[in-house]
From Swiss-Prot:
InterPro entries on file: AB_hydrolase_fold (IPR029058), Thioesterase (IPR001031)
Taxonomic lineage of the native organism: Bacteria, Bacillati, Cyanobacteriota, Cyanophyceae, Nostocales
Family to which this protein belongs: To Synechocystis PCC 6803 sll0249.
GO BP field: biosynthetic process
Organism: Nostoc sp. (strain PCC 7120 / SAG 25.82 / UTEX 2576)
Protein name per its UniProtKB record: Uncharacterized protein alr2406
Length: 250
């Protein structure tokens, strides 16, 4: 790990990593960014706790606290880590994370499977519209395949038989909550539930549009908000910024 790391971005799934790249490339012009990615083998179990343990092993290489950030399930990992290891985290930025952090798109998918007698493929196609908005049919098919793989790779142990929950509440370090006004997974109402545990130095912001992956569609808008938040936390841009990636497996 570099000694001048500013921001560590947490990714929960290799297959969704592509949707983080525009934002990370944009902010890497001003701050030094590393991407930590959780991976597990199909024949092995996975969990948020294991992801946090692996992240802690990686963060043990860093002698100072960093600004931690993540989207959706990646944000849930970042939040869980920040609560367990607060001295390792300078600030926490969560994108499309509900106040109940386990309420990701995976939970919505399994809830629909419980409620409706339609096929897995139909529900995934509906989920594509919820996450990305209306897309051409060929794009929808590709995104259905992406989501199908993400269901297998998620560290959240949702299933048709049980939806898991994670602890709710805030954190000790400065916190930024970001969402999108037209995200049906983490709606504006759901996002406002964070207000009950925000501190004076915390910040809640909504992108005007962009659905669940608003940071993919509007990387500059989202990036500017994050950069402003980090600079308020006394983060000084490095003379030479960069983007690196780290992959950890269980």
């Amino acid at each position: 790990m570099s000694d001048d790391l500013d921001v560590l971005w947490i990714s929960s799934s290799p297959v969704l990593q592509r949707f983080d790249k525009p934002l990370l490339q944009y902010i890497s012009k001003d701050v030094n960014v590393a991407q930590w990615e959780y991976r597990h083998h199909r024949d092995e179990g996975s969990s948020i706790d294991e992801a946090v343990d692996l992240l802690a092993e990686f963060m043990g290489q860093c002698p100072y606290p960093v600004n931690l950030a993540g989207h959706a399930a990646g944000g849930a990992i970042a939040l869980s880590f920040a609560r367990r290891y607060p001295k390792k985290v300078r600030s926490l930025s969560l994108l499309a994370v509900a106040s109940q952090p386990a309420n990701t798109w995976h939970a919505h998918y399994y809830l629909q499977r419980q409620l409706f007698t339609i096929s897995r493929e139909q529900i995934l196609a509906n989920t594509v519209r919820n996450l990305f908005g209306e897309q051409p049919s060929h794009t929808t098919k590709k995104l259905v395949a992406v989501l199908d793989r993400d269901l297998e790779q998620s560290p959240l142990l949702h299933s048709l038989f049980k939806l898991v929950h994670l602890p709710e509440g805030g954190v000790n370090m400065p916190l930024m909550i970001c969402g999108s006004k037209n995200d049906p997974i983490v709606s504006s109402t759901t996002l406002q539930d964070w207000s009950n545990c925000l501190k004076p130095e915390d910040h809640l912001w909504e992108c005007p549009k962009g659905h669940h992956f608003f940071h993919y569609f509007y990387p500059q808008t989202v990036g500017d908000q994050l950069l402003n938040f980090w600079q308020l936390r006394h983060l000084q841009p490095m003379q030479t910024s960069y983007l690196v990636s780290h992959h950890w497996q269980n």
